[in-house]
Amino acid sequence: MAAKLHFFVTSLAFFTLAVMTSGHWNNNQPNQCQTSVPSCFPIKPYIRVTLQAKSILQTPTFNYVAVVTLRKQNLLGFLEKAVDTNYGFRFSSSYFGSALGYMVDKINGTAASTQNQTFWQISSNGTALNCGVSTYYPRNNEVILFNFTTYANAGHV
């Protein structure tokens, strides 16, 4: 029970951080985040998710694609599996405690920077997600893009 409560608090807090730091909360956009504890039963189905990491702002540039099949879970789990199964894919994240959760800050050596006003924007079908890797649960056959961009390019200034 304590683990479920911890997961709930982490998910809710990270959702709040994602909304506060995104700077583009859109009340017309449906809530994309899972803020409640998912049921353990029935067993979740396997889903296939394509992860794309794209960086063209600085060298080395890259456009990396990993296709991952796992039981339905949060986006962080799919990133971890991509590292396990695809030797060319690496990421790091910072954990901000149970109140805030995880935030991806580096993919394949390219790091987000508040000084340079760059970050890894997460989107699906051209729509920026309003939550992060701890609370977003991809759908089957979804393509998730991690695009290295600037605050200005993403409309956050």
Model-predicted regions and their roles:
Residues 2-157:
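Ubiquitin-like/PB1-type beta-grasp interaction modules and other compact soluble beta-rich domains
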